[in-house]
Amino acid sequence: LVDCGMEQGPDLYVNQDIPVNPSEIDYILITHAHIDHSGNIPLLVKKGFSGEIITTFATADLCDIMLRDSAHIQEFEAEWRNRKARRSGEPEYEPIYTVADADAATKLLAPVDYGQKITLCDGIEVRFNDVGHLLGSASIEVWVTEGEVSKKIVFSGDVGNKNQPIIKDPQLVKEADYVVIESTYGDRTHGEDIPDYVGEFTRILRETFQKGGNVVIPSFAVGRTQEILYFIREIKEKNLLPEFPGFEVYVDSPLAIEATNVFNKNVKGCFDEDAMALVNQGINPLLFQGLKTTITSDESRQINFDTKPKVILSASGMCEAGRIRHHLKHNLWRPECTICFVGYQAVGTLGRKLIEGAQSVKLFGENITVNAKIEVLRGISGHADMNGLLDWLAGFEKVPDRVMVVHGEDTVTDHFAALVEEQFGCPAFAPYSGGSVDLATNEIITIGQKIPKKA
């Protein structure tokens, strides 16, 4: 099994059961640690999976903290629902999985190095290659032999955006009979220019600090928070804000703090040339004067009693949960403050409402007027765009026998599959859930079924 993620957020597809008994699976291969790729693995363990979970060292470290965090959220949500259920006499809600299930899953992690070809069992070999999406992220080459027939399948995982800070650009793979590729941005581009993140971010900080306000950044705890710390270290090192030399930066997310420690542990083999040049000079690319971390709720609350202009980085990135909602409550109404978005905001989320110009939002049962300036750091993305995906596919020296397009909205997967056929001249297939292909004959067996959305 390659990846087993969890659907998250409102109005998304039901988490479907996989079409095999988890106890019959021997190996799970994980491309990277994001919950939409790893989040359902503890559920498989709960249902009987006891094999090995193969992934890179950095992904194993991130899964160790992220799956436990996900389990804490399931338990907290179940307890909240059950308090309401007990009052109304409804049956109790069981969490999807527990912290004990997540702990059991992490004990099955079996990490490997990038570029290391390993034999899983008779007839199956695998190799993980850096795909530049997140620390530890990989595309996976799988060699399968059955009888006299051998085929090679390459799973792209999530292909990274070029020129991201800290991590390397996506590595190309030279050959495959079949390719399974993501298509998150398979119908759009990020723009031709490399954005000047540091320059734009410096402008936002200067304009806000001059008014005496805070810059509040809703940020994904893993990946995006570390990129922002990287930019701020550069701003401070180059003295780009000489009028505010000692400004403080709070990372107010226990998961983000743990993830930053994982980044610092997995420097070699994961960091790009620029980040490694700093490391080799004895400089931690994610550390600087004025950086403060808050673990406890009390420490978090104290941030809003400090009147000095500062940066507050907190999760969740779409403002749907977590400590960020408290910081929004204390800063949204203040015209001198700025809320700076640095990641995708899904439809229906509080973050999306704010970037679309909401004049008032409800937080903790209270209507909060939006007086703060809303900024978006454009172009910052961990995903390759349409051209980046095509560039990655162009790395194959021989055109694959077939390309399977997954991991995108249904109209986007169809669009990108047509684009692949047009550009490379090979059959491309955008399956629905349950779609299947005979790898020996290259025939589509089933197209699959569109999954109904939740009511």
Please report, for each region that a protein language model flagged, where it lies by residue.
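His/Asp/Glu-rich metal-coordinating catalytic cores
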Residues: 1-29, 38, 45-227, 233-244
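A polyampholytic, Gly/Pro-enriched intrinsically disordered region
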Residues: 74-79, 267-281, 362, 445-455
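Short, surface-exposed amphipathic charged segments that create phosphate/polyanion-binding patches used
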Residues: 124-128, 262-270, 390-391, 440-451
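Short internal beta-strands
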Residues: 52-60, 83, 180, 245-258, ...
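Hard-cation-handling environments
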Residues: 202-347, 362
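A short helix->loop->beta-strand "cap" motif at the edges of active sites that frequently abuts
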Residues: 48-52, 211-213, 244-247, 336-337, ...
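Generic long, charged, amphipathic alpha-helical segments
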Residues: 362-393
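C-terminal structured "cap/appendage" subdomains that terminate the fold
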Residues: 389-426
